[in-house]
């Protein structure tokens, strides 16, 4: 059975000033998602599921879903701040979504096969989908997951410093933890970040970082449901608390419930965080098209 691609497309896009998911950046108005789906099809994926918000469903179906009718099966699920387990009610004034792992839970009803999770507004590159598709196509058990580890040198911004989750791995390349680091940049040819002591620290170009590209089997939904209740009991009155994928993954690793293999990729990541980033992404996509990595018109 071919794996499914699960696309997190419900984000607000507030810093960008609009819905990044629907912004046409390619030569013929292609979105970043369009390139991800093109690469996923090349990487052996057999279905795409999008998690979105109900309020932009009409635009999404018109601008996104209609493109894929003859290329790959697609489904849509919805994330709502009111979608909580039995016994829990959204606190008055809570408008912030419950986070990326809450979004993943929305896929439970339609995903029965190994699946990948990606952000809608990140350009992951062909090789990322290749290594992830290969791993998921052979996934046949439970409690064994994976994450594509991007080389930090391939994720830097030309506009300034970035924050990244630097991966700690054991001798067999299994994830032991993700440490958030800030102020990452290339300085005098070396990659530096702010260490625990507040001082600049260097790291190797090939150090793996998490760009939220995960591979799971359906048993992950069960663990996520259980822990979401635990999360809500502790955080429901915190208006800013979010249930993130790394939070869930770290719990599974530290408790010995699951393993997460870190897959290396040569792909270069890029994305749009602020409106000012847009032109740089347009130029990078154009360069990839000119190099023959992608057709001028995807579909």
In which residue ranges do the predicted regions lie?
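A C-terminal functional module that forms or caps the active site or interfaces directly
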Residues: 225-258
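Conserved N-terminal catalytic core of the sugar/cofactor nucleotidyltransferase
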Residues: 1-7, 27-117, 124, 129, ...
């Amino acid at each position: 059975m071919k794996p499914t691609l699960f696309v997190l497309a419900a984000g607000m896009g507030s810093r960008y000033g609009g819905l990044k998911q629907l912004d046409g950046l390619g030569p013929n108005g292609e979105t970043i998602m369009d390139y991800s789906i093109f690469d996923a099809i090349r990487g052996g994926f057999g279905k795409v599921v999008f998690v979105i918000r109900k309020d932009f469903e009409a635009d999404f179906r018109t601008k996104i879903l209609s493109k894929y009718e003859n290329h790959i099966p697609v489904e849509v699920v919805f994330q709502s701040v009111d979608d909580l387990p039995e016994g829990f009610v959204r606190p008055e004034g809570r408008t912030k979504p419950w986070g990326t792992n809450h979004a993943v839970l929305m896929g439970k009803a339609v995903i029965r096969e190994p699946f990948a999770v990606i952000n809608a507004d990140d350009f992951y590159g062909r090789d990322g989908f290749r290594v992830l598709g290969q791993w998921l196509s052979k996934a046949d058990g439970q409690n064994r997951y994976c994450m594509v580890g991007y080389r930090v040198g391939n994720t830097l911004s030309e506009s300034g410093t970035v924050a990244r989750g630097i991966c700690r791995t054991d001798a067999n390349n299994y994830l032991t933890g993700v440490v958030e680091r800030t102020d990452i940049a290339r300085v005098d040819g070396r990659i530096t970040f702010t260490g625990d002591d507040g001082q600049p620290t260097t790291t190797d170009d090939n150090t793996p970082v998490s760009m939220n590209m995960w591979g799971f089997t359906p048993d992950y939904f069960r663990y996520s449901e259980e822990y979401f209740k635990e999360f809500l009991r502790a955080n429901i009155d915190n208006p800013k608390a979010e249930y993130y994928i790394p939070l869930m993954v770290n719990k599974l690793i530290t408790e010995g419930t699951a393993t997460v293999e870190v897959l290396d990729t040569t792909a270069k990541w890029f994305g749009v965080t602020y409106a000012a980033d847009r032109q740089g992404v347009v130029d990078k996509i154009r360069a990839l098209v000119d190099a023959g990595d992608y057709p001028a018109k995807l579909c």
